[in-house]
Amino acid sequence: MIGRTPKLSELVLGETAEALSLHCDEALENLSDDDEEDHQDRQVFIERPYAVSVPCKRCRQTISFVCVCAPEAIRTLNRLLSASLSLVCPECCN
């Protein structure tokens, strides 16, 4: 950082985000019949990492990030990015 006040351009890191596997390979064991029925009754949302790349609204440079969410949430994000939501890269924020 140069000077007394930080600037966004000085805070941008040059490293790129990498998708990591967050899946757990453990299995549930020794469930009683009641536990199995209760588990089946509940709707289970599995959150997974999704790599997202979109163009900057101003300069069209690719903005990439990874988010962890349920499949329905990533579909909602896709609809928003396809319709009314736009992102701006750090360089264009100034």
Swiss-Prot record:
Any single GO BP term: DNA-templated transcription
Positions of unnamed zinc fingers: 56-92
Intracellular or extracellular location(s): Host cytoplasm; Host nucleus
PTM note: Highly phosphorylated.
Gene3D superfamilies: 3.30.160.330
HAMAP family assigned: PPV_E7
Protein name as it appears in the record: Protein E7
The organism of origin for this protein: Cottontail rabbit papillomavirus (strain Kansas) (CRPV)
